[in-house]
Amino acid sequence: MQLNSTEIAELIKQRIAQFDVKSEARNEGTIVSVSDGIIRIHGLADAMQGEMIELPGNRFALALNLERDSVGAVIMGSYDGLSEGMKVKGTGRILEVPVGRGLLGRVLNTLGQPIDGKGPVENDGFSPIEVIAPGVIERKSVDQPVQTGLKAIDAMIPIGRGQRELIIGDRQVGKTAIAIDTIINQKDSGIKCVYVAIGQKASTIANVVRKLEEHGALANTIVVVASASEAAALQYLAPYAGCSMGEYFRDRGEDALIIYDDLSKQAVAYRQISLLLRRPPGREAYPGDVFYLHSRLLERAARVNAEYVEKFTNGAVKGQTGSLTALPIIETQAGDVSAFVPTNVISITDGQIFLTSQLFNSGIRPAVDPGISVSRVGGAAQTKIVKKLSGGIRTALAQYRELAAFAQFSSDLDEATRKQLDHGVKVTELMKQKQYSPMSVAQQSLVLFAAEKGYLSDVELNKIVDFEAALLSYANTQHAELMAEINAKADYNDAIVGKLTALLDDFKATQTW
């Protein structure tokens, strides 16, 4: 068989048409040095700030310092086996984490990988860990409450959906306890929770997860863990990863709550990374951008309007606002709130719950100091009945603390002062609450009403706790309809006042405490 020149030309053209060569441009570099979790790379000319760099052994580093001749990157995880001269690749991707409802009930690491042994995580996609916060026009004012279930906080330092409320205090004063109680109280509220553990002992985190599971709150919670044994880079990135997971719900017209436990350890991890990268240190050896470290994180907690949600979901969700409420925790040293990181976070947040060792050690738990604790926007979100009843409580406690200071120097006090002191002591006792026992709005309202209307005046101080327990038990069994009505509407009117008065009069007549 002979082929003429035309057929040969056609065959060659067909072969050329079928020949597929794909050119692949790779951004490669060489490791120049490895030390203390930091690598310096030569040759990654197109690297971006925050880009993931692929290392040998399916590991990644994060590009943080872009210099003229080299790139400084922090290794996310172990750096065993890495040595000078190894090749690395730029991925062209910013760090992303999985997001979605499938993450609820799971314990994850900073990169969104499961560490609870329950198999792979189902996700609805991925989200960058660094996201620009919603703008001014996209926000809505805070006017709906987040019930912590702790009467001292819900009455005196109320928290609203979309607020940033700092929990601050020394070590071992109950900061995490407040956060965990708040999560437990959300299991039936529809608010999804994210708990970010930064730089904590693995045993402490395991205990928190176990308590959430025991109280049925884990199914509504995502736990993100960067324990004390993990690399500084993972501790630094964990809050941003958790925030992206919480934003998934906010941007779809739902409510979410995120707890950062704690941001002091994140700041220390960031300081360690910055010093190793040879960035110039500032006050307390922190880098110059440590304020921005926390401000860009906490500004992402917001209440967004219906237009923002509709635009984000491409019209799938209409007429619904979304919120992400943040409860950052800061640990102080010997009560020093004027240190660098505490003052930064106080100025960023919308108020603070200040816990003191003195109150904690004297048995007042939660150890909230009402004198310097404040909620700047939560008052607008407080339920009507609790707002009406709590005004007198805060005043009574403030007057009591003022009078108690003077009473130490004077033995003969007039009757009015004695009554105020007696009332203040009893209200302080009434504000105590056991851990893992959150109270409903109706239960809080009943207890506050009893204090406000003088029903504690003839109750001995050592009987206050028993009085409260017996009162709540009586109300739940004999007046269940009234309690359900208050929980549903939370109104304060003459009819409710009449019913509460009748309930307390009937209870006082039983003398069952």
Swiss-Prot record:
Catalytic activity: ATP + H2O + 4 H(+)(in) = ADP + phosphate + 5 H(+)(out)
Site (Required for activity) location in chain: S373
Any one GO cellular component localisation term in the record: plasma membrane
InterPro entries registered for this protein in UniProt: ATP_synth_asu-like_sf, ATP_synth_asu_C, ATP_synth_asu_C_sf, ATP_synth_F1_a_nt-bd_dom, ATP_synth_F1_asu, ATPase_a/bsu_AS, ATPase_F1/V1/A1_a/bsu_N, ATPase_F1/V1/A1_a/bsu_N_sf
Membrane topology, as annotated: Peripheral membrane protein
Enzyme Commission number: 7.1.2.2
Superkingdom as given in the UniProt entry: Bacteria
Top-level class of the enzyme under EC nomenclature: translocase
Transmembrane segments: none
Keywords, in A-Z order: ATP synthesis, ATP-binding, Cell inner membrane, Cell membrane, CF(1), Hydrogen ion transport, Ion transport, Membrane, Nucleotide-binding, Translocase, Transport
Record Pfam families: ATP-synt_ab (PF00006), ATP-synt_ab_C (PF00306), ATP-synt_ab_N (PF02874)
Localization terms from the record: Cell inner membrane
UniProt binding sites for ATP: G169, D170, R171, Q172, V173, G174, K175, T176
SUPFAM superfamilies named in the record: C-terminal domain of alpha and beta subunits of F1 ATP synthase, N-terminal domain of alpha and beta subunits of F1 ATP synthase, P-loop containing nucleoside triphosphate hydrolases
Chief place of localization: membrane
GO molecular function: ADP binding; ATP binding; proton-transporting ATP synthase activity, rotational mechanism
Family that this chain belongs to: Belongs to the ATPase alpha/beta chains family.
Biological role stated in the UniProt entry: Produces ATP from ADP in the presence of a proton gradient across the membrane. The alpha chain is a regulatory subunit.
NCBIfam families, sorted: atpA (TIGR00962), PRK13343.1 (NF009884)
Subunit structure: F-type ATPases have 2 components, CF(1) - the catalytic core - and CF(0) - the membrane proton channel. CF(1) has five subunits: alpha(3), beta(3), gamma(1), delta(1), epsilon(1). CF(0) has three main subunits: a(1), b(2) and c(9-12). The alpha and beta chains form an alternating ring which encloses part of the gamma chain. CF(1) is attached to CF(0) by a central stalk formed by the gamma and epsilon chains, while a peripheral stalk is formed by the delta and b chains.
Protein known as: ATP synthase subunit alpha
Organism of this sequence: Aeromonas salmonicida (strain A449)
Phylogenetic placement of the source organism: Bacteria, Pseudomonadati, Pseudomonadota, Gammaproteobacteria, Aeromonadales
